[in-house]
Amino acid sequence: MGDPKEAGAEASPSGAAARGGLSLLSQADSEEPSAQGSALFLGGNEVKSRAVVKYSSAPPRTAFARLEEKTDLKLPPANWLRESAKLGPAGTTILGNSKKSKPFSSFGMAYDFIDSVGNDVDVVSDSENIKKLLKIPYSKSHVSMAVHRIGRTLLLDELDIQELFMRSSQTGDWTWLKEFYQRLIDQKWQRKKKSKEHWYQKAILSKFLYYSINGDGAAQPVPSPAEQEESSSSQQTHESEGAAWPAPFEMPSSVSEDPSASSQGREPLEPSCIVGHVASAPKEQNLTTLFNDGENSQGLKNDFVRNILWTFEDIHMLVGSNMPIFGGGRYPAVSLRLRDNNKPINVLTGIDYWLDNLICNVPELVMCFHVNGIVQKYEMIKTEEIPNLENSNFSTKVIKDIAQNILSFLKSNCTKEGHTYWLFKASGSDIVKLYDLTTLCEETEDKYQNPFTMPVAILLYKVACNMMMKKNQNKKHYGTIRTLLLNCVKLLDKSRHPQIIASANYMLSELFQLDEPKKEESSDSPLNENSDESYSEEEEEMADSDENGSYSTSSDPADDNKAVAIIKSVGELSVPEKYKSIHQIRPSCAFPVCHDTEERCRLVLSYVLEGLKSVDSSIKKESDLPAADPSTPIPLKYEDESTRGGPEGLEKQMALFLDKMGSIQKGSCSGQSGMTPGSWQHKMKLQLILKSSKAYYILSDAAMSLQKYGRALRYIKLALQSHDTYCCLCTNMLSEVLLFLSQYLTLCGDIQLMLAQNANNRAAHLEEFNYQTKEDQEILHSLHRESSCQGFAWATDLSTDLESQLSVSCKCYEAANEILQFSDLKSQNPEHYVQVLKRMGNIRNEIGVFYMNQAAALQGERVVSKSVSAAEQQLWKKSFSCFEKGIHNFESIDDATNAALLLCNTGRLMRVCAQAHCGAEDEFKREFSPEEGLYYSKAVDYYLKALRSLGTRDMHPIVWDSVNWELSTTYFTMATLQQDYAPLSRKAQEQIEKEVSEAMMKSLKHCDVDSATARQPLCQYRAATIHHRLASMYHSCLRNQVGDEHLRKQHRVLADLHYSKAAKLFQLLKDAPCELLRVQLERVAFAEFQMSSQNSNVGKLKTLSGALDIMVRTEHAFQLIRKELVEECDQPKNDEATPAADSSPNLNREEVIKLLSIFESRLSFLLLQSIKLMSSSKRKMSSNAEEDIVLQTNKQIYSQLLRATANRNSTLLERIEVVICLLEQLASGSSRSSGSAVP
């Protein structure tokens, strides 16, 4: 801790407000001297002292009146005990006539300067207590002080044993301490009365000070004897009363937690420091009475004239002082003292004077000497000269060592925050003992007999509030805040202080960031590395360490064993750094490390539950409600799905929900427990319920990511139930809370969708959904005190019906969107709005696909009736409506990709509609109907819209390829149906052929055979099939065409072209040997048809040669067939258990046999025709070696083929192998003939 940077009177943010409206003094107006840090050099020993006035209620300084010699101070001045404009409102206090310091004076200062407590300041105390501690080695007087630890700060207050036990005799409390004290000093306690000399000295000092401020004593009448007697008795009464101790047993009647209790006459205070991003918690009403004047003030008001931040060497102290300060000396400020001339100043008095001047930064002391009340003379003494006065010599260095040793002793042993420690030294004793009164009190019947409990708890709470309110507060201090709050809750009785406990538990829940991943473990300043020296309750139980043992080795009476630590001799305090070795930072209060989200949320919910219990216990109307039994399930309203009406019922519930949300906006909701809106119970319960809803939402989201959908639905149900209760209590719904609700409903929609898609694990999901912890039950019971929690039951049912689940999911998204619409959150949260619309589009796509599949299933079940049923048409309409709405959702957020996917699905729906109209007529008489054409055309339109939506393939290649494929399929299907079921009754053959050709070419255009994608083989097969069909169509046209030679030639060229392309594409595929073989056979048939129209043998031979060449190129197809047959034959041998049906799934044996028979016959025919033509041409023409080779080869192959076909016992594989062998011979023969022809 460094020295304060500012000089002079510094203002506390809460000083004036909390002090009855007294204004803070500026540096210019302050009656204090400038608080510049000063180094005093006394006797060669340097002592550093710096004083900064943080607050002062004193009026501007006035010069003291120097009394004439022989003035009789025994006579009262005219202004004695009367108010004066020169004195201001704190006149009697300034002149030292106020009653003694209250036992909670340090708490009053701590409340006013809460920023300094816990970290910046080492000690907070009355200056009288500081002086008493520093005089311990010099004084035989008894010392009795209460010590409290708040973080790094120690609060010191006088613990007046006499006053305490006098009260004990009247009320019966504190008896445990009285008995302990009597055992400790081994004698019966008796109250010691003040001597007459004591009262005489106080009276003469008071009169002297009044004389010193009175410039004209004769101007005012002397008080009458009756007034003097009254004043004197009043003063003695104050002295006899001493401190005003609060009643530790019950709460005073005025300290009511009833929000309707009168608050007239109370001073305004700063609100309690409850942090929360929704709203601030109410101020603690109990705090109000603790700070006000009157019989119930309990002494917690900061009534010091000055609050000074005093730095003595390295010790930082917040000190309260009432010392009178005057002007009129050689310096701007002096302190005024009255001394008996016959009694020399002793060391104790010198230390008193020196410390007072140091603390108040007063550079000079004015001493007035008297004899028997008669003024003799005045003497001016500088502050730095006080330690060197005759008979009052003391070492300032020793005072510094005493201060450092005492602070080290206390900090090392007062380790438990919130505990009351008692620093005690008996009169005439050299032993100083430290006791833990809180621990001793807990051993009694009523552990709340400690009157310090409430002030300490409030201070712990306020310090924690203040730390959380700081915007620049590092999260590493969260451990400190948590420790402060836990100790606060531990100190208080739940039944007596529900508001503080509820607030503290809410703040504890706020420490955990629910909506952020845990990042502290990897940061530079983790939470468990606090710089604060306080620590959590788990770390309190420490074994006897060396440092503690060094204080407890005394063999004093048995009660000494209960002392936390002992200083065996006060002389040790004067030894430099005697206790420095033990003045160390204690283990830091580690913030709990939550390893996962669920653990973190569960911790938050535990604090929320404790807070809710505190609130519920304080509501008066609780007796009117039946007691909640956590073990008894809460009956929930339930409607059977059959009576609820499915989606129609959901529509009604949605309408009711939206109406309810509208009423919330108007503030017409109220709870059932009787809480008064605006009361602390009402506000705190709202905060706690909102926190619980957030925690359950995060738990649900975490379960969702783990695919635990039943658990996720249970948590989101609890979140929505919490929010429903919040809605019932809230009179003015904040936009942020509405945003939370939209997020909850969005997540609920996600969960319902995932449950619909994972129906196979329904039993496990149901088990998770029905499980409930005791903590959840208790929170739910608290919610049921305010609401039925059924507002969102429609969204959280776990249905077994797929359609119902999808509908619920959709309604959740719609509700989330409606909230964003009517609360104008759409523009404020554009990202969430986009996500909601995406989900709406997605769920409508899912529902549209569901209805489309149902329609397709109905279509497949049609056997008797071939007309389209009304049910199918209704499903088409539902599906189309969902797709249309989904497309609108995606288009509204410019999501072209998803809009294209839904347009694609709409195209698919049109194809389903087209397929439904294909079975209207008998299969043999069937024609491609106009309805089919209409729906296929609509499908094409939607696919084209999808492509236009995407723009280019680069935008989203996968979606683009998918839409392209579907469009190609639609064109192909439409062309195939027109080709296979030509509508000849409505259209001419030529028109049909033209339409088929155009559709096929469009299909081919959208069939990408070049891109190396997973769909490439399918595209190649589709393209090959298209070419094959076109070739077959032109071949058929050529056969049936008569007349137009130009058209015939065109058809012949196109047929040859498409056959060639089909063969090439099928050649690339490894799983289409039959298709390749069929194409080649059709090409051979096409060659035979051409040959039939030829007249010359040369032309026929050329055509035959081309046909045989096509036959040779079929070897590849036969090789593939042979390979599959071999694998099929080997399969049973390798694995007898594997059925043969599993092998060669792509090979159709019947089709292979059929094609093989055709192939054998056509090869036989071609070979025979070739042999005939070549033989006849050989007879007519001269011999040709090349032709001889070909002829000879053809004869051999023909002979072998005849023998093979004649053998009826050959297997399919053997026949295939023979064909392959013959084709190889035919190919080699052709190559030899070609080779011999080369010169």
Curated annotation (Swiss-Prot):
**Gene of this entry:** Edrf1
Composition bias, kind Acidic residues: at what positions?
Answer: 530-547
Q: What does this protein do?
A: Transcription factor involved in erythroid differentiation. Involved in transcriptional activation of the globin gene.
What is this protein called in UniProt?
Answer: Erythroid differentiation-related factor 1
A Gene Ontology term for the protein's cellular component: nucleus
Q: What organism is this sequence from?
A: Mus musculus
Which residues lie within the region annotated Disordered?
Answer: 1-39, 219-269, 517-559, 620-646
Q: Which InterPro entries match?
A: EDRF1_N, EDRF1_TPR
Q: Does the keyword Ubl conjugation apply?
A: no
Question: Where is the sequence biased in composition, kind Low complexity?
Answer: 9-28, 253-263
- Name the source's superkingdom: Eukaryota
Sorted alphabetically, the keyword list is:
Activator, Nucleus, Repeat, TPR repeat, Transcription, Transcription regulation
The subcellular location is: Nucleus
What stretches of residues are TPR repeats? Answer: 693-726, 914-953
